Amino acid sequence: MEHIRTPKVEQVRLLQRRAGQRKPLLGTLYLSATHTIFVENHPETRRETWVLHSMVSGLERPPGGPTGSQLVLRCKDFRVFHLLFPLERDCVDVHASLTRLSRPESYRELYCLSINPNTNQEEREKSWSLVLPSQDYQRMGLPNNLWVATAANSEYKMCDSYPAQLFVSRWASPAVLMGSSRFRSRGRLPVLSYFHQDTLAAVCRCSQPLSGFSGRSEEDEQMVTAVMKANPGSDFIYVVDTRPRLNAMANRAAGKGYESEDHYGNIKLHFSGIDNIHVMRSSQQRILDVGEQRTPSMSDFLLGLENSGWLKHIKAVLDAGVFIAKAIADEGVSVLVHCSDGWDRTAQACSVASVLLEPYYRTMKGLMVLIEKDWVSFGHKFSHRYGHLDGDPREVSPVLDQFLEVLWQLAQQFPCAFQFNERFLLDLRTLAYSCQDGTFLGNSEKERRSLRLQERSFSVWSRLWRDREKYWNPLYRAEQSQTQGVLRPNTTPYCFKMWKGLYSPAETPAPPAQTPVDFLSSVREGSQQLEQELANQQEVAAGGPAPLGTRQATGSPDRGANQLPEGGGTQEED
Amino acid sequence: MEFAELIKTPRVDGVVLHRPFMPTVEGTLCLTGHHLILSSRQDNTEELWLLHSNIDSIEKRFLGSLGTIIVKCKDLRMIQLDIPGMEECLNIGSSIEALSTLDSVSLMYPYFYRPMFEVIEDGWNSFLPEDAFKDLEAMTDEWRLSEVNRDFRVCTTYPPLVAVPRNVDDDTLRKAAGFRHGGRFPVLSYYHKKNGMVMMRSGQPLTGTNGRRCKEDERLINATLRPGKRGYVIDTRTISVAQQAKARGGGFETEANYPQWRRIHKAIERSNVLQDSLVKLVEACNDQSHSMDRWLSKLEASNWQTHVKEILTTACLAAQCIDREGASVLVHGTEGTDSTLQVTSLAQIILDPACRTIQGFQGLVEREWLQAGHPFAQRCSMSAYSNSKPRHEAPGFLLFLDCVWQVLRQFPCSFQFTEQLLVLLFEHAYASQFGTFLGNSAAERVRLSLPEKTVSLWSWVNRPQEIDHLSNPLYEPNSLVIWPSVAPQSLLLWEGVFLRWNRSPRCQEEAHEEMVHIIEYNKELQNKVNSLRRQLAQLETQEPPLQTP
């Protein structure tokens, strides 16, 4: 590779404090096209450390000492590596190379797009068909007599950050769609996100209206009425503006803003008070600092946690979801959700509400579909938010992190409700940042299509699905009360904890204790092997194929629910 | 009977009861000498039986002729009684207040309680010092059981039997006792089988301002050291607190007189500070209207988690000296009945796998708290809601249980019991039908004839059905020393106690049931497979291969 000045440096010391390491390792550092690789000299262990270039978020060169020159490597998964080079020249070279390698200027430079697309063609195509938003609309029973598909955006002409496939109220004419789109920031008109089959209420999403202080659009008002009409059970809808009220009001001065209850006769307005991406970015930096404090006192820690504001923001996101879920499930009233552009806070609020409302989204497959639909297809700007390319650092913000953390917080309250475990959330987070697959590249469906990602890369979902055994929550059982129906979390502040697995993984007891998840998973695995042996032995004992059914009949009929389905799930025909 | 004088109104009809996570019940309220009872006289609702001694304080409110009494319990629960009629309400209120603050121990419920279960093993005999010593004797002959305190004269807060170095005679012990706070001369707390090192505990040495010394005391503790080895004195107080203690006749071991000992000072807080923390913490937990910022700052300001961290850190230090440094340790604070016991008992949880079993943990509580003279009656007479000014009250035992919970949470598979056992001990330490936690010392328990006149908590706990209920399905005996992380990020608020009445336990219970289910199912399969294997093996041996066609 043209950017690698020195492919190999010997006698380098590496220290990773965050992993609980105390003494540096001595070894050789290699730079490849994709990874920084460190191989320990120790002949017995030869431990290897691999760091993807795309995971590097920062490089620093603190002043060197008599023992050599230092390079600090910070990663997007919050790992920090301290490297010590014997020669300053090597350090300078590695620094320069990594600076360039970790900040690709175009998608072309990304490793996942440099593979030969024609090998594994079948596998690649299969990987992209594993999770499709269309499957989810089908699952919700759409289209139906209330919600219909529209071709208005099939060429991305009405809204270039929306998907081609949109579901809208049956009562909205093409003219109303166009007019409403023109009156919404970046053309993001109200469309369906989630349809609740029990109450017929729906979660819809859009961006802020271009109302300014007094602007109106007849079509947009008709559009909102159409959303209301698509729910036969109620004569108004909630408009949830996920921003703090002050921010929403300030937007009016720029010709944007929020819906006036006077102009839209059939709405009730609710503000959720979720702060913007800049506040979130600096808040996360502060909670990271809290996690990295060396030997803090309890007061340092708790005050640091408070000052970071992070848990307050997590609570705000969950509260927004709870408000929407209650409106849908308890009141049977549809909700229209927006923030400013409708691709960050709106994605968070809609998907949190969906997880609370719909047990399917608490399964691995369900969460994948939800993220594919609410985030990927609806134009959450993955490449900007997670810094895939060298760009404006002010566009970077941990929006998806917060959604995943809300799920983690929920799993603390409902240990049996989710099919997946903490590892799944952590790995999913890493994959959103790491550019190893095509799914999260780009900022919209349109951009992804023009990059021809499906022809040039794999989908992230097949990678996660392949490892599903590792992500299984042993306490999950489909028929438990918390698995069914609507989740009603307690959102009192004392219910929120710092997500230690993400922000402070180094502080562990010694010897490392087995987690209940690992323990129960291994027991569960053991049970499966025993079941197998039992079946075999019964066969031998009976001198022929024994009635395998004894277990299902007498033992534990519910066990069937614990088996992970093989293959890609239900819609495999295509 | 005196109770009747205190009960102004024995029963009121039409009382409405509100309690956490249960439907509202309307029924008859009855006051007896020991209980507040509310019964709807219908089969499908659960009656309320509340011990008066569990009531920490009450609050009365009136709306017209409808009175409301909020009963705040020592186990931190709050219940509300709506009582029609102002006079009835006032009478009930003052009766409860009188009955819940009875001074005389002999009027306490344990003296009246008759067990409704069969006592399989009398808990009063389950953990006798002589039995514990038999285990020690099997490991070493360097220690003996001394009867120097047979009649509680040498030390009023020690049990009649204590383990001391074999080559130190009772006379030396008596003299050393004169040099230690409350007569609490250094005695054996724990013997570390792996390397023969020991942990001892005592009261502070009475050096005073002019640096008194006591040769016998020095000889006693030096007798526990191996030749050429040094030991550690862990003083649970800061150096400045220890210095100040000199003015009141106390003090600490100086380098000059104890050259073979290195002294380390820690900063575990004293009783009134701890009580204050408990009150603040519970107040913060009960206010659901807090914003996130306010909650975190209230939690911080209560300092509760700071105490947890400090106590665990000190226990880890003691354990480290013994296991890693291979040195013996003497632990004391001022009296040696509070922070000292927190440290010595937690260090044993860390070092000794036997303390992590159900029986072993009871034995630890018996040895290091009850026999060791933690003044339960004084410390646990009031809890977080009491309005009166605390005198001797302090949640030292609750803090110990909290620390055990932290370790249990970090090592979820290493304890034979669940959190439930810890919660149960917390409840019974503050209010109980059993006599175990009455009195302040072994001497008092003898004087009060508790073993003869009351039932032991251990008699109840150690029945198969209760053991079953307290067992941890994830338990796998772990013979290792376990080192908990004491970083603040690793220490959590003990929800099982402090948020117990604010959050529904249903989902966590479901998770627990599921764990039990997974493990039971595995055992069941294991049994089936084993019996099939045996059958197959039998078939093979009985039937030689002659029946081939």
Q: What are these model-derived regions, one by one?
A:
Chain A
Residues 1-335, 351-574:
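Cys-dependent protein tyrosine phosphatase-like superfamily
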Residues 337-339:
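Hydrophobic anchor at the beta1->P-loop junction of P-loop NTPases
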Residues 341-347:
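Ser/Thr-glycine-rich phosphate-binding loops at phosphate-binding pockets of nucleotides
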